[in-house]
Amino acid sequence: KIMLSIIFLWGLILFFSVPLGLLVLNIFKVNFLSRSFDKFIISFWIGISIVALIQLFLSGWFVMNFWFPVVFSLFSLFLLKNNLIKSDLSQWWKNLFFQKSIFVGGIILLLSSIFYMLNSPIVWDDTGGYHIGNIEWLSQYGITYGIALIHNRLGILSSWNTVIATLNHGLFEHSI
């Protein structure tokens, strides 16, 4: 269950991050990227950064729930109507499947790393210290002003935690 939920959630994050990043790259007319996969990676990081910062901003007024990824996914569906974004995505998809050895190797690497990560214990001290608590708090209450006065670990706020907090509901709760 955990492995499938992680694969699904990362697919969802890719789905709403890449078109948003491509929109930004197309608005700024970025054409110096020689390889198409470089543009894919950069558009993913731009998209997920924008999503994380928007969610961090909105967490002051709203609880981080599963409606945020739904709204970003609907916006991504709207962005897929753009011809430039659609052509970039179809070009990547064709290149990925034409180079079957890279695709099969990537799938094997992805699955083996997921199996390794899911079967190894979490040894990071700070994960249990404030990451998990912060994610739980954001998914249940959003930003609460003055919460750091209770304990200093609660005062750490990360935009990446807001992305995870929006996905920490229902079937996926405590699975990521």
Residue ranges: model-predicted function:
Residues 113-176:
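Active-site lumenal/periplasmic loops and adjacent helix-entry segments of GT-C-fold
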Residues 2-3, 36-37, 107, 113-114, ...:
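Generic signal for short, ordered secondary-structure residues
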Residues 97-118:
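Internal/C-terminal transmembrane anchor helices
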Residues 45, 49, 103-107, 155:
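A generic short alpha-helical patch detector that favors 3-5-residue windows
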Residues 25-29, 103-108, 132-137:
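Short hydrophobic/aromatic-rich motifs at helix boundaries and adjacent loops
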Residues 26, 31, 65, 82-83, ...:
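Detector for Asparagine
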